[in-house]
Design a protein with these regions (language model features):
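Extracellular/periplasmic catalytic domains that process cell-envelope and extracellular macromolecules
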Residues: 7-11, 30, 80-82, 109-114, ...
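Extracytoplasmic
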Residues: 11-13, 44-46, 63-68, 84-86, ...
Length: 235
């Protein structure tokens, strides 16, 4: 997470950490007691789910560990184009809902340009001093604590200028004018929440993220409501 700061602990109670054989792999979002939503590119064979996390290295109290009963990436996911980068995970046993572990609402409408959002994750953060961003002095590292950044929805027209021909209608871009706040490597699969509603899933962007002024690109959740609801019903 670039240009963000440590989140108020448990202020994003739907935030999920996905682990692969004990290593942090991706973010995700709790959307019901049984279901977690993430990006298809986060799929690995031995996914474990951690809920109620803030500091990944410390036991805090509200953490819950879950195994995954079913991993369901979108059937038409394409790694090269990032198309349909969405995946559902069914938990083996339901989350115990609490103040620190709570599902996020799915959207009833699509995000509007300029809408204010929060992106959260345990992805790379920059250690640089102000003014060194993009210089060889710029350093990135993985934080222990969940980070949050305030960004807004970028109009499709300007996002298309940054990524000609690569942004589909089922994607949404978000960032800040001129760059400086963005999701980064390791934030993948995590939530973009606008007005308390899950509007995006961290999908892709310009690499390396600490030297770019281009916005991040997110899977647009409103495009997948049918698929999400159908899949949850059938499984």
């Amino acid at each position: 997470m670039l240009g963000g700061e440590e989140c108020e602990p448990h202020s994003q109670p739907w935030q999920v950490a996905l682990f692969e054989r004990g290593r942090f792999n991706c973010g995700a979002s709790l959307i019901s007691a049984h279901w977690v939503l993430s990006a298809a590119h986060c799929q690995t064979r031995f996914l474990r789910v951690r809920l109620g996390e803030h500091n990944l290295r410390k036991r805090d109290g509200p953490e819950q560990l879950r195994t995954v009963a079913r991993i369901i990436p979108h059937p038409r996911y394409e790694a090269r184009s990032h198309r349909h980068d969405v995946m559902l995970l069914r938990l083996t046993r339901p989350a115990r809902l609490s103040r620190q572990v709570r599902p996020v609402a799915l959207p009833t409408r699509c995000p509007q340009p300029g809408e204010a959002c929060v992106v959260s994750g345990w992805g790379l953060v920059s250690d640089d001093k102000p003014g060194t961003k993009g210089s060889p002095k710029s350093q990135v590292s993985l934080p222990d604590t969940l980070h949050c950044a305030n960004i807004s929805v970028i109009p499709a027209t300007s996002c298309n200028e940054d990524y000609p021909g690569r942004v589909m209608a089922s994607m949404v871009c978000a960032g800040v004018e001129g760059g400086g706040a963005d999701s980064c490597e390791g934030d993948s699969g995590g939530p973009l929440v606008c007005g308390g509603v899950l509007q995006g899933i961290v999908s892709w962007g310009d690499v390396p993220c600490d030297t770019t002024t281009k916005p991040g690109v997110y899977t647009k959740v409103c495009s997948y409501l049918e698929w999400i609801k159908e899949t949850m019903k059938r499984n």
